[in-house]
Swiss-Prot record:
Residues 25-114 form the Ig-like C1-type domain. It is found in: Secreted. The keyword Signal applies. This is Beta-2-microglobulin.
Length: 119
């Protein structure tokens, strides 16, 4: 009986250690098509390789949250890290700046990555 209790405790301890593994998300911000001023496009923020799964992602226009944003379902890779795609329609121009802001337990403060229209 004591052997069973020890084995059960070791199993529980090893499972609880899975939550302790943390990986910071990789953030990629890009448009679906090459940017052309005045031409409708899609702004994408692909967030990948993160663990645990709790994450907040916002698309920003001139530092303010864009409200009409869609996203994929939370998915995981072979290594059990997670990934998501957030996207919205937008029409680029010379004056507006776009970015993706991500909050995750691995970041002390939210991380913001600007869209580079040349990418």
């Amino acid at each position: 009986m004591a052997r069973f209790v020890v084995v059960a405790l070791l199993a529980l301890l090893s499972l609880s250690g899975l939550e302790a593994i943390q990986h910071a998300p990789k953030i990629q911000v890009y448009s679906r098509h090459p940017a052309e001023n005045g031409k409708p496009n899609f702004l994408n923020c692909y967030v990948s390789g993160f663990h645990p799964s709790d994450i907040e992602v916002d698309l920003l226009k001139n530092g303010k949250k864009i409200e009409k944003v869609e996203h994929s379902d939370l998915s995981f890779s072979k290594d059990w890290s997670f990934y998501l795609l957030y996207y919205t329609e937008f029409t680029p121009n010379e004056k507006d700046e776009y970015a993706c802001r991500v909050s995750h337990v691995t970041f002390p403060t939210p991380k913001t990555v600007k869209w580079d229209r040349t990418m």
